Amino acid sequence: MKNSEKRGRKHKRQDASSAENAGGEVKEASANEASLPQSPEPVSASEANPSPSRRSRGRGKKRRLNNESEAGNQRTSSPERSRSRLHHSDTKNGDCSNGMIVSTTTESIPAAPSWETVVKVVPSMDAVVKVFCVHTEPNFSLPWQRKRQYSSGSSGFIIGGRRVLTNAHSVEHHTQVKLKKRGSDTKYLATVLAIGTECDIALLTVTDDEFWEGVSPVEFGDLPALQDAVTVVGYPIGGDTISVTSGVVSRMEILSYVHGSTELLGLQIDAAINSGNSGGPAFNDKGKCVGIAFQSLKHEDAENIGYVIPTPVIVHFIQDYEKHDKYTGFPVLGIEWQKMENPDLRKSMGMESHQKGVRIRRIEPTAPESQVLKPSDIILSFDGVNIANDGTVPFRHGERIGFSYLISQKYTGDSALVKVLRNKEILEFNIKLAIHKRLIPAHISGKPPSYFIVAGFVFTTVSVPYLRSEYGKEYEFDAPVKLLEKHLHAMAQSVDEQLVVVSQVLVSDINIGYEEIVNTQVVAFNGKPVKNLKGLAGMVENCEDEYMKFNLDYDQIVVLDTKTAKEATLDILTTHCIPSAMSDDLKTEERN
């Protein structure tokens, strides 16, 4: 792509706390919490009158998505990938819209739950609670600030050990979480014990003993079969009391989890999952929980398609927390692989007619398996289970599933036996499994974003939340092409590698001529490669050369007088009411 093209942000669309992202009730947080659905928070002056447009170098738009995940990646039967939309049944980060999801086609009314099924579910319904959360999200575009707080409502349910399960996106960036039991007028303060972003599950508890009185925990059932009846219970939009919808299991496969930006086992059901249902349990006909409602599909040709987190994923999350006293995540095999369905391809790789498997294309440099596996190895089996040429393994009678399911059943730090074919020789390796280290992480949790400012240049690291903050929900089409390429294909070469960019330039006399530099990667400083933001901040702070030279992407350079630039920084910070030239984590690390 030509260097003469400008890079930058587009005009931001009005987001209103991203209420459109996935339904649910959203209201401004206040001391007086109204129980009725209210309007999304108003547009701020900056949102209503965006700054001058900065043209992007993104891909051409093909469709509009309401969420950070594409329906085409869900492997559903959607005939038109360009029009389908996946939604949290609550909303992004728990933010909920107070509007119903409307389809252009006439939706059929789901059948009412049978009396026998309802009777069996009734004892478990008392364990279903309503979750009230106040969120305060970081401002990734202005990392020294936080966004205006907002509140959301979703569902949850009580399990053993005085704990409550709900969705991770329902309590992400929480500042306060309260729970209310069925038939109660009291809201109890809750503590978040763990948040699993990949699996979209959060674990809560309540210290008040009164909350646990007179309620029995929900019991988990086995993985349901296709066409098994399910009843979804929760507190969706449209009322304040508990709601029950019913349907059947219509599909079971590896799904893209919208919030987690990962792929795990999921159930597709035809029971209605509406805004506010997030975190609510799905019961079988015996009154046992077989899943957690978490997202739905919006498509003009789709009706009543909801998705449920199944019990194997839930149990993995709970056992992971109990085993490590924290959530460590779902391990992955750090490879990219290719199907071996073509017979000529198999012969060229030295495979016998009876051998099946998948070819390794690339290996994550930070993954433990990079020490033993090599590109073009053929993975024949994982932990004794043979892998087919299309990458599937036997699941249940008459069913097959992607072999990533086998990996997701493991825990971080577990070992797995991998059999590979290399140069017509069969080899076996014991591999220690670990979580995925992404160059551009899907989530930044537990701390505000890092930043560093000198001479008005705002340096920060790129993450998916940052891209979404800069370019909106359609960042995959509007962000600069080079950032998107790194997001989709780049692999971190070390565990501490980060993608550092000039986010923006706060205009001052010292940076005349550099004002249009926006979201451009910093490649080197004074001839030394920039590995991460901490390293860049350290080099700038300790620079004693006459000039500071920043090498940027697209072969751009920035040269500043070192003494003048450092002196001008304080005035720029004062002008823009920025409390510090760097985030607290960089200060702490530098002192250490």
Curated annotation (Swiss-Prot):
It is an enzyme of class 3 (hydrolase). Keywords: Hydrolase, Nucleus, Protease, Serine protease. Residues 78-93 have a biased composition (Basic and acidic residues). Changing P579A: Reduces protease activity. The active site is at H169, D200, S278. The keyword Nucleus applies. Induction: Induced by trans-zeatin (at protein level). Expressed in roots, cotyledons, rosette leaves, cauline leaves, stems, flowers and siliques. It comes from Arabidopsis thaliana (Mouse-ear cress). InterPro entries: DEGP_PDZ, DEGP_PDZ_sf, PDZ, PDZ_sf, Peptidase_S1_PA, Peptidase_S1_PA_chymotrypsin, Peptidase_S1C. Residues 54-64 have a biased composition (Basic residues). The keyword Iron does not apply. Serine protease that degrades the two-component response regulator ARR4. Regulates ARR4 stability by targeting ARR4 in the nucleus for degradation. Acts upstream of ARR4 and regulates the activity of ARR4 in cytokinin and light-signaling pathways. ARR4 mediates the cross-talk between light and cytokinin signaling through modulation of the activity of phytochrome B. Its EC number is 3.4.21.-. GO terms for cellular component: nucleolus; nucleus. This is Protease Do-like 9. It comes from the Eukaryota. One of its GO terms (biological process) is proteolysis. Homooctamer formed by 4 homodimers. Interacts with ARR4. Residues 141-318 are annotated as: Serine protease. Residues 334-414 form the PDZ domain. Residues 1-101 are annotated as: Disordered. Residues 68-77 have a biased composition (Polar residues). It is found in: Nucleus. Belongs to the peptidase S1C family. GO terms for molecular function: serine-type endopeptidase activity; serine-type peptidase activity. The lineage of its organism: Eukaryota, Viridiplantae, Streptophyta, Embryophyta, Tracheophyta.
